[in-house]
Amino acid sequence: QNLNNGPHWLGLLVDSVDTVLALEPDHAALKKLGTKVGVAARRQAPAGSLIRRANREARAFAPSTHIANDPTDLEVRAFAAPVGIAEDPVTGSLNASLAQWLMADGHMPAAYSARQGTVLGRSGQVFLSQDTHGQVWVGGDVVGCIQGTVNL
């Protein structure tokens, strides 16, 4: 899916969280592709309900039990080799674009949470919601990694 809410992403919805977490992308090939790629999978989604709501492409989904007690609804990975970032631990622009697409196509409800950064050991959780006007909002907590002052 072509995703563009300012930053451009190629979005992929795959069959399971296990598939997302097992990806070993060729970053040189992704850099040549020239666009950032986001990959996501629903966590513990009822397979039948997703198949019934599939749009023109044939899609088959199966629930994952990779992280059995994880409260999040979606697992996300962001590969941004074209801008010099092999994998980003948590990406607001990607999660917002994914939410616009997945909510519009009925794959996700109007409010859900996503986990990203698991493979990097920098797991983060974001909360996504769509208001009554159709605007998608992204929120979450931050972990400060560095603090300082820049004098210009």
Question: Where are the predicted features?
Answer:
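Active-site proximal loop and beta-alpha junction motif in alpha/beta enzyme cores
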Residues: 1-152
